[in-house]
Regions:
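Trp- and acidic/polar-enriched beta-sheet ligand-binding modules for extracellular glycan
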Residues: 168, 191-282
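Noncatalytic carbohydrate-binding groove/subsite architecture in carbohydrate-active enzymes
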Residues: 350, 356, 383-521, 525
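Disordered, acidic Ser/Thr/Pro-rich linker "stalks" and the adjacent N-terminal cap
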Residues: 89-178, 190-193, 278-287, 295
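Aromatic/acidic polysaccharide-binding cleft in carbohydrate-active enzymes
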Residues: 493, 497-608, 616
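Carbohydrate-binding surface patches
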Residues: 601-651, 655-660, 697-703
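Acidic, Ser/Thr/Pro-rich beta/coil linker or hinge segments at domain junctions
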Residues: 644-695
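N-terminal substrate-binding region of glycoside hydrolase catalytic domains
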Residues: 32-123, 276-325, 333-348, 352-355, ...
Length: 706
């Protein structure tokens, strides 16, 4: 007898592997690869920041009831402000470091008052990035043509704060419109300025050239800088390049004009008003090839290593709102379970983060996991800088919420790579883990988190891309292990979806297949949890290319008022997992890998996938996916003990089926919508051998005694 109980078989109807050419599913009941999980911890939902007015539109009683019908119970709160280079005023009430002028470094109020319903991000006026990963409406102050504005690096990366014994040089990168001849630079320094810095050019053919290196110009190394606005003659002969970098290693620690009081943060880091590059004219002036404009579409592109979280009351971004903390917990979206909460980090202060956690603790909200920042790899900063901030924040915040652990880094993608950092080449996450180890701080990483949107191109053969992503999740797990992520901590997909872009495939049957597979495969690989992104009912959109059509990543297609209307395949996938495959609730289940044999010509390319769940009620749940767009498949389910003989499973039982008979998407541009949308079909299986028919693009769950 296996640890999961005795399999029910059909006496005399034994089917040996290889005895027939038809496909068949084989479940090994005591497979050593089985993974323990609890449904109310493993499969959840993600709520994020939104555009103006969308939080109110989402959190209505009708929408909340519709979302909870998914059966996905735990919740993670996503922090869009971290993608938009904004500081999060998690409580609109709070204090400024320069209160008289309503500016400086913000700390939200941690005293209890009226419930917080909405919160906002605040743009950072000392920004040095031309683009961001959120609304992307702001611009870099390095090439905006205004000498009264400036970029400043994050003072919390200064040695005066970190005291970690590590060098954290800061940098700015300029990407010209095309390769240009460069022999001079004008760096218009603000306060504090760099006393030691190096002006460099990129030797690679392009930014993705693995052989590229940052090379100092012949006269580009400055060891006794004194600020000002000097014209630097970098070389006797111009160097042709498209990418330039100013690497700053020592600062003046001088106070900027107009600073209030004697705040150490005003002395820490580096500040630059404007940069220009080009060649020296005969009259000694600079023929500047940089485009200076206060617009992210018109200025020369720049990117920086970090940003000062200093801002003003007038910088509130009314178009980027976050759900209020109280509102999230009061909504019951988390079903009373612990919610994974974030704090700002890359663009925030530890003081504000600490106040947030004190507020959560005072309210008694259930929180066990706290994610520090979001998508730092997508900001293309130095992973060693992120690691230093991570450790500093984690140690500062530890113990405020009793029993809570800190984690991250919420990678933009599992296969994160560094960008133009030849001193730290390869895996961004690998460099992050290595930096934690150098500090003796790997124990501060309480869980590993990343986001997963595997289909980048929504045009072409979607089904081939589905097959490819099956391998991708396994490759990510292998990569984490190779990077040194401890297996003793939870590995969590804190957001997943079909694609980061909206298009037709997100609303067609393959979207349900992918959602189901991500959830079960991640658990089967030893992952701890996966959270679905896209809980807000949505209207179809196209964010990719004309060939991608219109669709939405959502549980429901919305009506014109943003309320849940027609169910989408992602809802069916969630319900099949939470209400059919498993027993709802907190009881322990075992995830078993299923083996599909004999696919051959009947199912070319491995289009059939299967997993099984040993349930606490003594039953066996089996999930089958058919990722063929055209072929239906009928096959038996076999069970065996390890080393034993595979035998055909026997009914009675239950079966749920979801395919084209239940759902079809009608493409009509922005007016696209389901032409058919009904729940998965449910039927009872009679006694006798279990044979299952999978429709094209179909999901099937079978539950039998084991």
């Amino acid at each position: 007898m296996s640890r999961f109980g005795r399999a029910v078989i059909v006496a005399g109807a034994m089917m040996l592997a290889g005895a027939t050419s038809e496909p068949r599913v084989v479940i090994v009941l005591d497979d050593p690869r089985a993974q323990l999980f609890r449904p109310d911890e493993a499969w959840g939902l993600a709520i994020d920041g939104a555009q103006r007015g969308e939080v109110d539109q989402l959190l209505t009683p009708a929408n909340l009831a519709a979302i909870q019908r998914s059966g996905l119970r735990p919740l993670t709160y996503r922090l869009r402000t971290e993608l938009g280079i904004e500081a999060w005023h998690w409580n609109p009430a709070g204090t400024w470091s320069d209160a008289a002028r309503a500016q400086g470094y913000w700390t939200s109020n941690d005293t209890l008052g009226l419930p917080i319903q909405l919160s906002w991000g605040y743009k950072l006026p000392r920004r040095g990035d031309t683009v961001d990963n959120a609304n992307d409406t702001d611009f870099s102050r390095l090439t905006d043509g205004d000498r009264t504005t400036f970029w400043k690096s994050n003072p919390y990366l200064d040695a005066s704060f970190l005291k970690d014994g590590q060098a954290h040089p800061q940098w700015l990168i300029v990407k010209l419109d095309q390769p240009r001849a460069i022999d001079a630079a004008r760096i218009d320094w603000a306060e504090p300025y760099a006393t030691a810095f190096e002006v460099q050019y990129w030797t690679g053919a392009d930014e993705d050239d693995d052989g590229g290196r940052w090379q100092a110009f012949p006269h580009g190394t400055i060891t006794s800088g004194s600020g000002g606005r000097p014209l630097l003659r970098l070389a006797e002969a111009p160097v042709k390049t498209q990418f330039l970098r100013v690497l700053m290693t020592a600062g003046s620690h001088t106070m900027m004009p107009g600073a209030a009081g004697d705040d150490w943060r005003d002395r820490a880091g580096f500040a630059v008003n404007e940069v220009g590059f080009g060649t020296v004219r005969a009259d000694g002036s600079l023929a500047d090839v940089v485009h200076h404009a206060a617009s992210h579409t018109a200025q020369t592109w720049t990117h920086v290593s970090s940003t000062d979280p200093w801002h003003r009351a007038v910088d509130r971004d009314a178009d980027l709102e976050q759900p209020g903390i109280d509102r999230v917990f009061d909504s019951k979206l988390g079903n009373g379970l612990p919610v994974m909460m974030p704090t700002g980090m890359l663009f925030d202060t530890p003081e504000n983060a600490a106040a947030e956690l004190r507020y959560i603790a005072a309210r008694g909200f259930p929180v066990k996991q706290i994610e520090l920042g979001e998508e730092p790899d997508g900001q293309y900063g130095d992973p060693a800088d992120y690691a230093a901030l991570y450790v500093a924040f984690a140690r500062r915040l530890k113990g405020i919420v009793p029993g809570a652990v800190f984690g991250g880094p919420s990678l933009q993608q599992g296969d994160s790579d560094t960008w133009m950092l030849p001193n730290a080449p390869g895996s961004w996450n690998g460099q992050f883990i290595a930096a934690l180890k150098r500090q003796g701080a790997l124990r501060e990483l309480g869980f590993m988190s990343f986001e997963y949107y595997p289909i980048e191109d929504l045009c072409g053969d979607i089904h081939t891309k589905l097959l490819r992503q099956s391998r991708t999740l396994g490759e990510i797990a292998d990569r984490f292990a190779a990077e040194g992520v401890p297996r003793s901590i939870p590995w969590i997909i804190t957001e997943y979806g079909f694609s980061a872009y909206a298009g037709r495939a997100e609303s067609e049957l393959p979207s349900g297949l992918l959602a189901a597979e991500i959830n079960v495969r991640w658990i089967a690989l030893g992952g701890s949890a996966a959270y679905m992104f896209g809980i807000a009912p949505a209207e179809p959109d196209n964010q990719h290319a004309a060939c991608a059509g219109y669709g939405a990543l959502s549980l429901y297609r919305s009506d014109s008022a943003g309320q849940a209307a027609e169910p989408m395949p992602s809802l069916a996938a969630a319900q099949l997992l939470t209400r059919a495959l498993t027993v709802p609730g907190h009881d322990l289940h075992w995830m078993l890998p299923g083996r599909v044999e004999g696919q051959g010509k009947t199912a070319p390319g491995g289009t059939l996938k299967s997993w099984a769940v040993a349930r606490p009620d003594g039953k066996l749940g089996v999930l089958l996916l058919n990722r063929s767009a055209t072929q239906s498949v009928t096959l038996p389910i076999l069970v065996q003990a390890r080393g034993g003989t595979a035998m055909v499973a026997n009914g009675p039982g239950e079966i749920w089926t979801y395919g084209a008979a239940q759902y079809q998407w009608r493409s009509a541009g922005p007016e696209s919508r389901p032409s058919r949308s009904v729940p998965p079909a449910h039927a009872l299986l009679p006694a006798g051998p279990v044979r299952v028919t999978l429709p094209p693009d179909g999901m099937v769950v079978v539950v039998i005694r084991r």
